[in-house]
Amino acid sequence: MTGSAQNRSPELQRVYQMWQGVLSDRGSDLTTMRDTVEEFYRKNFHLAEDVEVEAVFDPVPGLWITTSAGRGRSLLYFHGGGYALGSSKAHAEMASWIARAARARVFVLDYRRAPEYRFPAAVEDALLAYRWILNSGADPRTVVVGGDSAGGGLTLALLTSLRDRAEPLPGCAVCISPWVDLEMTGASIIGKADLDPLLTRAGLQQFADWYLGGQNPRQPLVSPLHADLRGLPPLLIQVGTSEILLDDALRLAERASAAGVPVTLCQYEDMPHVWHVFASFLPQGRQAANEIGDFVMQHTARAAAANQQPR
């Protein structure tokens, strides 16, 4: 056991133990992996009484998550899972913590997953969902986009796609433990391998193969680390220091800052991949959710207040 592991709180030790069990049978077929992930979330996480859930099927599938904290802004959220696992239902509880902190309605999109639907299907779905939210009357200045892991990469793919099409950009964006380099060239892929309880290079490679089906992993919409990031809205990046995707986040922050993007980078000591999932009992999970809420309100408050003024 490392010194870092020896100093973990009981709550954090519980997180590591729980994450280790999710994909413990890495030789399973995709259907079994999906079922295991959904069962993990169903068994361990539950919505608070003040959370309202509204299912949407057309024009895009997903769940609206709303809490009693308010609904003055909209957050379009892309779940993680290597573009192959995860769902809006699995991420509903995590989304509710963010919704409460940001005083926002959160729409968790069920984008088409690989390998049944390869790149660029997820990006196309993200564009459709964003346009739908704006066409429903939302002021883009009060809209936020965000996601975790693969969803963090999808967030950046959406932003660069909107910019290149000269479409309205959201007020800000949030990337949690983002996966933005599908070639896995970051030093932490190897350097943090003994610390990360969930992800492995081999596992990420399998997800990349499913998503790409032989396509070039360096395409900017696949690996936004290689994208032109100029002109994007303020960006919050959160990452744990014990995850193999640490360098994805650090390099993204460096390149976005160099491109003139206002970047807030927050590293959480000893946190594993997407620790926010455990906000119900992990203090750092609640802290990270509250940090997202503060960031969102900082960058959308003026527009949200203006929209509430009588006309």
Regions found by a protein language model. Give the residues of each.
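The serine-hydrolase catalytic nucleophile loop
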Residues: L85-S96, D248
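Serine-hydrolase catalytic core
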Residues: Q215-M271
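Catalytic nucleophile-loop/oxyanion-hole region of alpha/beta-hydrolase
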Residues: S88, M94, F107-T142, A279-G285
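A glycine/proline-hinged amphipathic helix-loop "lid/cap" segment
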Residues: M1-G70, A301-R311
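Hydrolase active-site cap/lid region
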Residues: T160-Q215, G231
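Catalytic active-site module of serine/aspartate enzymes centered on a nucleophile-bearing elbow/loop
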Residues: L282-R311
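Short strand-loop-helix active-site module centered on a catalytic nucleophile
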Residues: G62, L76, I98, F119-L182, ...
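Short beta-strand element of the alpha/beta-hydrolase
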Residues: G72-G81
